[in-house]
Amino acid sequence: MNSYDFMGLTKKECQDLCEQRNLIFRLISKDGDIYLPYPEDRRTDRVCVELEAGKVTKVVLQ
């Protein structure tokens, strides 16, 4: 799994890709507004994303 696979995708495209790969999707922020903080626990099946102008601009695989 590579974080670059998710970069530039829309929220829906990212969610669909996560579902295809059996990963947990977590939206951290959208256009600078924080929705959820980054989790403190570590997992191998979670994708945390930040969106700007409708596209994924930051991905943290946890």
Regions found by a protein language model. Name each.
Residues M1-Q62:
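Exposed, flexible binding/inhibitory loops of compact, secreted disulfide-stabilized domains
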